[in-house]
Amino acid sequence: MAKEKFDRSKEHANIGTIGHVDHGKTTLTAAIATVLAKNGDTVAQSYDMIDNAPEEKERGITINTAHIEYQTDKRHYAHVDCPGHADYVKNMITGAAQMDGGILVVSAADGPMPQTREHILLSRNVGVPALVVFLNKVDMVDDEELLELVEMEVRDLLSEYDFPGDDVPVIAGSALKALEGDAEYEQKILDLMQAVDDYIPTPERDSDKPFMMPVEDVFSITGRGTVATGRVERGQIKVGEEVEIIGMHETSKTTVTGVEMFRKLLDYAEAGDNIGALLRGVAREDVQRGQVLAAPGSITPHTKFKAEVYVLSKDEGGRHTPFFTNYRPQFYFRTTDVTGVVNLPEGTEMVMPGDNVEMTVELIAPIAIEDGTRFSIREGGRTVGSGVVTEIFE
């Protein structure tokens, strides 16, 4: 059977279900796919198929994640659902499943629970732009006032973590009833997806962002100059444009005088391309792995930042023992390791393998970073943690 061609005419967005264990995230995921399948462009998915999520490796961390896709009239969605709480934490911190928006599932029978709070906090820290709420299991609640109370609690909780709690759409329904084909509850799923379509902003495509390419390798071509190679992470670069060389040393400027891909000369390159960029007037020793080429003024070098970090458990090949403030591992950003010193928050004595923690880091050399930059923490070449920058200090 020939593979279907991916339809690019529709907007694409990545979303995921978040919320407390057993509040119905996976049932909702199955219900969305099943209800949308009745309306056309989507393949129905069973609960079991989603629940038996395959293991994936991301930055050396094992994560169970189910990926499904479905379509509304407006968009094509890639939806990620995780079976376990630990999988969520890892998923959000490593960026294994980049989320342009989330559906927060809260059981109307229980109200917000500890993981509800934790997932909202994580969404805020890792930069999920918008959340929509699905109050699930409303068929189990007879009291209209109780529903209103739960909705208020959820809105307050969202506001507490800097989401616009008063404006976030809240849809009440029952994923199980929708999955069983109850027309009233199927409509609630369509209402939810309408809210997701309308409320979650269309993500900016990588190729529309300012240019950046992490440098992987550098060599000189006699008579032509210095070439930096790497994969364009975002944006586009055209021959003749200026770029900055950022990280490790003082930032410098140069002009890209040639772009090559697979030994062919190009006029321009864009996000996803593996290229060699010929740099005017740059000596081979002026560029090194770990730096980035970037559109002038788009990203700056820093040494001190706050980050949300997941520490690998012993079973995942991580440390066997806890670490404390002043721990000095390597921080691996894009293509290189830089030593850094860890400062734990007040009241956190130590961090155990398997924990997630917010920490402050000071690197010994500046690196091009911004909010949302991902990194790994390594010791002697093995990964012991994974993190995302949440705030920059200096």
Swiss-Prot record:
Residues 10-204 form the tr-type G domain. GTP binds at residues 19-26, 81-85, 136-139. Residues 81-84 are annotated as: G3. GO terms for cellular component: cytosol. It holds the Pfam family GTP_EFTU. Residues 174-176 are annotated as: G5. Keywords: Cytoplasm, Elongation factor, GTP-binding, Hydrolase, Magnesium, Metal-binding, Nucleotide-binding, Protein biosynthesis. The keyword Membrane does not apply. Residues 60-64 are annotated as: G2. Mg(2+) binds at residue 26. It catalyses: GTP + H2O = GDP + phosphate + H(+). It is found in: Cytoplasm. Its EC number is 3.6.5.3. Residues 19-26 are annotated as: G1. The keyword Protein biosynthesis applies. Residues 136-139 are annotated as: G4. GO terms for molecular function: GTP binding; GTPase activity; translation elongation factor activity. GTP hydrolase that promotes the GTP-dependent binding of aminoacyl-tRNA to the A-site of ribosomes during protein biosynthesis. Monomer. PANTHER family: ELONGATION FACTOR TU, MITOCHONDRIAL (PTHR43721:SF22), ELONGATION FACTOR TU-RELATED (PTHR43721). Belongs to the TRAFAC class translation factor GTPase superfamily. Classic translation factor GTPase family. EF-Tu/EF-1A subfamily. This is Elongation factor Tu. It comes from Staphylococcus epidermidis (strain ATCC 35984 / DSM 28319 / BCRC 17069 / CCUG 31568 / BM 3577 / RP62A).
